Amino acid sequence: MCDEEVAALVVDNGSGMCKAGFAGDDAPRAVFPSIVGRPRHQGVMVGMGQKDSYVGDEAQSKRGILTLKYPIEHGIVTNWDDMEKIWHHTFYNELRVAPEEHPVLLTEAPLNPKANREKMTQIMFETFNTPAMYVAIQAVLSLYASGRTTGIVLDSGDGVSHTVPIYEGYALPHAILRLDLAGRDLTDYLMKILTERGYSFTTTAEREIVRDIKEKLCYVALDFEQEMATAASSSSLEKSYELPDGQVITIGNERFRCPEALFQPSFLGMEACGIHETTYNSIMKCDVDIRKDLYANTVLSGGTTMYPGIADRMQKEITALAPSTMKIKIIAPPERKYSVWIGGSILASLSTFQQMWISKQEYDESGPSIVHRKCF
């Protein structure tokens, strides 16, 4: 227990889920939704100990009477008061540690506004009084977790997807591409296409039900047109899902139409390229000499890459785009849902990393802008 005293805390604040734990562990101790819920109705029973806000799983379990808000949208914190509540909940209720006793490693999406990391830094030092902190890029951590120093990471979470090419440990910033299309957009899209089937989901609480349907039943088709034809001609692809009130709904082609939007963003009315093309474009922005290594080390990471069939589809799509002789390998580790956190745990426990922390002293001397100098 004694090394627990100084263990760094690793907090991967995703748009959808917050993953937190201790550096050196092989999995996060706490995984909970990045949600803050506030009551929609007036409390009438005195002495119930009702709170004015609920965080994480507690908000999720009381969602029927709450308005749920996600303080992180597209990887960027949009509500700092709620974000502080989530961090407070992480330290004091989930990990049960005093943040002033541990260095804290936070993560963020690449190409985030600079003000975002400055504010994160400021809150850590001024509100939580951490002795040291660091902000790492999510995709870089995923590559660490896969045991590579070269590769291109497609990291797709709930709020943002991005492709980050890394060569011998150096991220290539000019070739990083960001796509604001991820899990939450797919949940919204599934809500929309289920409405066409006559099932109406509208409230923030019902969106969580749709998210569950998405996670349990959706998959990526290898050939979309062919799959659509199969779905139209037989009921072999239909699955049923029981809602919390016992009502059973049936979904068919929605199962693969929903994640297809990752490959065809036009389904969502977006002009962007799909994840396969974004990955290819990212590789093409790199030096011609290193492309071969990137094609052979394409690493998937994040919860939105968990759909069955996504790796095979990526392999097929990138093979079609790349030169015909190129060897293409898509790496989809089974733990990729948490690979950002695992990478953070590895990084924060390296002896060589210890001089990289931003200390309270450095912060006091330079202010929040120190984060741009010390963190990539």
Swiss-Prot record:
EC identifiers of the protein: 3.6.4.-
Alphabetical keyword list = Acetylation, ATP-binding, Cytoplasm, Cytoskeleton, Hydrolase, Methylation, Nucleotide-binding, Oxidation
> Extra notes?
In Drosophila there are 6 closely related actin genes.
Share what the entry says about its subunit structure, partners included: Interacts with Rab6.
Alphabetized Pfam families for the sequence: Actin (PF00022)
**What function is annotated for this protein?**
Actins are highly conserved proteins that are involved in various types of cell motility and are ubiquitously expressed in all eukaryotic cells. Multiple isoforms are involved in various cellular functions such as cytoskeleton structure, cell mobility, chromosome movement and muscle contraction.
Q: Which residues form the propeptide?
A: 1-2
Location in or out of the cell: Cytoplasm, Cytoskeleton
Question: Mind telling me what this protein is named?
Answer: Actin-5C
* Residues with the Tele-methylhistidine modification: 74
Give the organism the record lists. Answer: Drosophila melanogaster (Fruit fly)
GO BP term, example:
ovarian fusome organization
Q: What reactions does this protein catalyze?
A: ATP + H2O = ADP + phosphate + H(+)
PROSITE patterns assigned to the protein according to its UniProt record, in alphabetical order: ACTINS_1, ACTINS_2, ACTINS_ACT_LIKE
Query: What gene is this protein a product of?
Result: Act5C
Annotated SUPFAM superfamilies: Actin-like ATPase domain
Which PANTHER family does the entry mention?
A: ACTIN (PTHR11937)
| Record note on modification | N-terminal cleavage of acetylated cysteine of immature actin by ACTMAP.
